[in-house]
A protein has these predicted regions:
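Regulatory cytosolic signal-relay segments
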Residues: 1-16, 33
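Catalytic-site or vestigial catalytic-site microsegments of nucleotide-handling domains
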Residues: 17-30
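Hydrophobic framework residues that shape the active-site pocket
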Residues: 28, 55, 74-75
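Alpha-helical scaffold within the catalytic cores of cyclic-nucleotide enzymes
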Residues: 46-64, 80-121, 146-159, 184
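A short pre-motif secondary-structure segment
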Residues: 66-68
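Short beta-strand->loop micro-motif that forms the acidic, two-metal-ion catalytic signature
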Residues: 70-84
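A short glycine-enriched loop-to-beta-strand structural element that forms part of the catalytic core
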Residues: 77, 115-131, 170-171
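Cytosolic regulatory/linker segments at or just downstream of nucleotide-handling modules
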Residues: 128-130, 157-207
């Protein structure tokens, strides 16, 4: 893209409807303590990198763009810089596949005697500003806006919904649900989200 249009290498953004995913390891403290007690910080870094590598491949295979890593948290988005008409579908599909990959990791962790690993993912769809943000000398291609913030809030809310194997691995908003053509959804709850006056209806996929 940059080779075809070098003008994109400048500060500025555009308004666009997109889908956003935030994903985080839940219960990371026991895992961190395990490596700390065994005096193995290198092992912890290797574990995080393995997790990030697995999940990043899924994001990229589904046409997503990894915005940034924040510790063990991944932020990704769809529909920029390359258009993706079914961006909501691909974001939810990514969340489902990441949850499936985590189940494989759980078995590996169990074999190694590690504490169980769970992930929580939140997806939202809405209008944001996307573009190069930063200074004249250093900038990142990123997204900002209320719709982005809601995805992060939803990810944090996954901790409130327990399952037999951990927590609800993926929840998304009605804005995302309304654009899903090939994924069935079930309403999970109506929740109060910081910065929102009205309750937000959240859903999970029927797998």
């Amino acid at each position: 893209i940059l080779q075809k249009d070098p003008s994109k290498l400048k500060l500025g953004g555009e308004r666009k409807e997109m889908s956003f995913l935030f994903m985080d390891i839940v219960g990371f403290t026991p895992i961190s303590e395990y490596y700390k007690n065994n005096d193995d910080p290198e092992g912890l870094v290797a574990l995080i990198n393995d997790y990030l590598n697995r999940m990043t491949k899924i994001v990229l295979n589904n046409g997503g763009c990894v915005d940034k890593y924040m510790g063990d948290c991944i932020m990704a988005f769809w529909n920029a810089p390359i258009d993706c008409p079914n961006h909501a579908e691909m974001a939810v599909k990514t969340g489902i596949e990441c949850a499936e990959e985590t189940e494989k990791l759980k078995k590996i962790f169990k074999e190694k005697g590690l504490p169980p690993i769970n992930i929580g993912s939140g997806v939202n769809t809405g209008t944001c500003i996307v573009g190069n943000m930063g200074s004249d000398t250093r900038f990142d291609y990123s997204v900002i806006g209320d719709a982005v913030n809601l995805a992060a809030r939803l990810e944090a809310s996954t901790r409130n919904y327990k399952t037999e194997t951990g927590i609800e691995p993926l929840i998304y908003s009605s804005y995302t649900k309304d654009q899903l053509k090939n994924i069935k959804s079930v309403e999970l709850d109506k929740i109060k989200v910081k910065g929102k006056d009205e309750l937000v209806t959240i859903y999970k996929p029927v797998i």
